[in-house]
Amino acid sequence: MVDSGPIVSLRDVRRDYALGAERVHALQGVSLDVERGDYVAIVGPSGCGKSTLLNLIGVIDQPTSGTVTIAGKRVDAMSDREATSFRLHNIGFVFQRFYLMPILSALENVTLPMAEAKLRREERDARAAELLAYVGLSSRERHRPSELSGGEQQRVAIARALANHPALLLADEPTGELDARTGTEIISLFQRLNSDGTTIVVVTHDEDLAKAARHNVHMRDGRIVAA
């Protein structure tokens, strides 16, 4: 049975860090729901807690208190092994930097998450080719990152993030290292992904990317101030 509730649900989440003798309150009582099929941009000034929130949604970090439920599963107290497996099969990540393996081709980079998930070589290659075609890089699948433009590298990174059919795509400043024209192309790709059913949560300072999302969540000083 498919869970019909929100794909992301946070309740009264706090995240504190020790900074020397001081405690930094990165998130202060955050509650948030993201519905399946939604496209949400988290916006706000630097240091307001956007990336900390995204790390909790992505099960990269755990809250100091509160609950985090992703795709119907409580994730706020998972072991490292459980969190790694959950991320591999449920969450795709896109970052400001592309983090592609320089010695591998575009196609080989896209196959990496599938290899970790133990898919057969033939399945991996077919899925990677399909994804590279989706992002407009069929003719570049044998090229290494050094032979690709920044926009092309980000498209490879997006294809890689989709490799294991994730329930949720998370992106942290995905247009941050791209020029305006290339950034616009990536924004259009995210809109197409969402139109095709992908649930997306992005953290961004890019006003155009935020405007393209269906909903904006505004943060300040570790709190959601508008949603």
Predicted segments with their positions:
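ABC family nucleotide-binding domain
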Residues: 5-219
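Conserved switch/coupling elements of ABC/ABC-like ATPase nucleotide-binding domains
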Residues: 221-227
